[in-house]
Curated annotation (Swiss-Prot):
Start and end residues of each stretch annotated as G1: 13-20
Compartment(s) where it occurs, according to its Swiss-Prot or TrEMBL record: Cytoplasm
G5: region residues: 184-186
Name of the coding gene: tuf
Main location: cytoplasm
PANTHER family, A to Z: TRANSLATION FACTOR (PTHR23115)
GO MF annotation: an example: GTP binding
Recorded coiled-coil stretches: none
Record region (G4): 145-148
Region named G3: 90-93
Transmembrane residue ranges: none
Binding positions for Mg(2+) per the UniProt entry: S20
Function of the protein: GTP hydrolase that promotes the GTP-dependent binding of aminoacyl-tRNA to the A-site of ribosomes during protein biosynthesis.
Organism of origin: Haloquadratum walsbyi (strain DSM 16790 / HBSQ001)
Protein name: Elongation factor 1-alpha
Length: 421
């Protein structure tokens, strides 16, 4: 683990616009491709009489492995820039991407949007930008990729830029904050250093732009919220819940409550990386032990918080959702599974209160009969089993969710208000 500040980075954009290649290139340029992978390629290259290690080999190999059905997990690859230590959180195309992006399994701080110069804005470009906006990603760096295919044409680059700008304004992203960079992930132009092929461009390289991102501000003033991932029994210690602190801090001596299981007690010890610590804060993965709590008292999906400000348990909640893919239409009474932080609970959409214009967020229709793919709406939701969830304007880390059904992510959303049980 690096002592530089940490950034979670999402790489988003339409399929085949070059996201994997860009990830490969970023890892390659920052010396983060695992040594054994490089060695393997170097040997292959030498055997084939092509001395010298080429980036293309890494990518060819990734492509072959993908064809063999071995997905190269571009998620959770790590690289350093001068000022930051980056983790690439799930990239689209990864089957759980949308779910993970939403449920905070990988809350991204910032995102790189990859748009192919020869294709421009495509359907998933829209979906991912809208998602990024819904989930509170503020800084967007746009890599206009495959510039080599369009002969590094400034005119094409400007056309794509205009098109993306229009999209950002539609979803109310602050377009002035967006940084555009003409790149070729395959050839390496403007990824690590400025390219002579785009002499008309005087902006930073992609790595420079990443290095110039503002530092994420972890919310320490919010109360402790620690979603439980697993519960272990460790001999000599007892029951040890494990999870990531999303907000606030936890220390030995704290009086805590687990919701919705509705049990509590005093924290005895807090451990990180097998060492006892006096305090853990946002982003820390911890195991801790609470006096009087047994293995059967709590479970994955519970949220731990201070007894004086216990996590909220919803009888019903109002949420703003965007429907990404549904084979037909969604009507009141539909009961898919909601994934929020570490919890997975079947929830019924009791009513569809308003249909929104996805571009402006304005109300387009009151009490619509149904919503379908591409629609945004405000809905009232009733969990079928107790669920701890928070309004996203108060604790955003516990205020967003993914809706899954039939093995796919149907919708994403954020909690507007909670009617407590």
């Amino acid at each position: 683990m690096s002592d530089k500040p940490h950034q979670n980075l999402a790489i988003i954009g339409h399929v085949d616009h070059g996201k994997s290649t860009l990830v490969g290139r970023l890892l390659f340029e920052t010396g983060s491709v695992p040594e054994h992978v490089i060695e393997q390629h170097r040997e292959e290259a030498e055997e084939k009489g092509k001395g010298g290690f080429e980036f293309a080999y890494v990518m060819d190999n990734l492509a072959e492995e993908r064809e063999r059905g071995v997905t190269i997990d571009i998620a959770h690859q790590e690289f350093d820039t001068e000022d930051y230590y980056f983790t690439i959180v799930d990239c689209p195309g990864h089957r759980d991407f949308v779910k993970n992006m939403i449920t905070g399994a990988s809350q991204a701080d910032n995102a790189v949007l990859v748009v192919a110069a020869d294709d421009g804005v495509a359907p998933q470009t829209r979906e991912h930008v809208f998602l990024a906006r819904t989930l509170g990603i503020n800084e967007l760096i746009i890599g206009v990729n495959k510039m080599d295919i369009v002969d590094y044409s400034e005119e094409t680059y400007e056309d794509v830029k205009t098109e993306v700008d229009k999209l950002l304004k539609q979803v109310q992203f602050n377009a002035n904050d967006a940084k555009y960079i003409p790149i070729s992930a395959f050839e390496g132009d403007n990824v690590a250093e400025s390219s002579d092929n785009t002499s008309w461009f005087d902006g930073p390289s992609l790595l420079e732009a990443l290095n110039n991102l503002p530092e994420p501000q972890p919310p320490t003033d919010a109360p402790l919220r620690l979603p439980i991932q697993d519960v272990y029994t460790i001999s000599g210690i007892g029951t040890v819940p494990v999870g990531r602190v999303e907000t606030g801090t936890v220390s030995p001596g704290d009086d805590v409550s687990f919701q919705p299981s509705d049990v509590g007690g005093e924290v005895k010890t807090v451990e990180m990386h097998h060492e006892e610590v006096d305090q853990a804060g946002p982003g820390d993965n911890v195991g801790f032990n609470v006096r009087g709590i047994g293995k059967d008292d709590i479970r994955r999906g519970d949220v731990c918080g201070p007894s004086s400000n216990a996590p909220t348990v919803a009888e019903t909640f109002k949420a703003q959702v965007v429907v990404m893919q549904h084979p037909s239409v969604i009507t009141a009474g539909y009961t898919p599974v909601f994934h929020a932080h570490t919890a997975q609970v079947a929830c019924t959409i009791e009513s569809i209160d308003q249909k929104l214009d996805p571009a402006s967020g304005e109300v387009a229709e009151e009490d619509p009969d149904f919503i379908k793919s591409g629609d945004a709406a405000v809905v009232t939701v009733r969990p079928q089993k107790p669920l701890s969830i928070e309004p996203s304007n108060e604790i955003p880390e516990l205020g967003s969710f993914a809706v899954r059904d039939m093995g796919q992510t149907i919708a994403a959303g954020k909690v507007l208000e909670v009617d407590e049980r």
